[in-house]
Amino acid sequence: MNEAIMTIYTADCRENAMNTLYPRKVTITCTDDLAKAAAYDHVCAEYAGNRRSNSAFRCADCLPLDLDNSHSENPADWKTLDDVNATFPGVGYYAVPSRNHMKEKDGKAARPRYHLYFPIDPVTDAAEYRRMKEYMLAMFPYFDDKAKDAARFLFGVKGAQAEFMGGDIE
């Protein structure tokens, strides 16, 4: 299985929702690259001045989506990476358990939670980038529907582990 190349930008911090500066460009060529980078708060787009905002969006070659399993309290309804693979057969993507993977959150039972990274051809229009996320949500409505804008960041995960799933991307 060939892993895909994509670019993310990291901050110098972890779990800082107020941060908007992502100065470190990281080219992801394998799971080890992503595991190291995902230890820090990060974005999957380039922004003018390295400052995250919708208006500063410049380019992205990765579509990040969250699989939080917030759609149901019934464990039998929770979705797994196998469900993602079945919905997008042959599509390669990276998966990193989120910082709240298998932990109680907001009084709700522990459940599988993942950050998924789909490498894409470069996109330079924020509206098109959002439409791509909306398309993915239409195909798999279990992704977090609040994470569609072009300025979405992902919290870093201490001890992040990454997997390449689903297939080959040439």
Predicted feature residues:
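A common structural junction motif
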Residues: 88-92, 134-144
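Hydrophobic, well-ordered secondary-structure segments
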Residues: 126-133, 137, 153
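Epigenetic mark-reader domains in eukaryotic nuclear proteins
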Residues: 14, 169-170
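Short, conserved secondary-structure transition motifs
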Residues: 102-103, 122-124, 145-169
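Signature for HUH/AEP ssDNA processing cores
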Residues: 1-114, 118-131
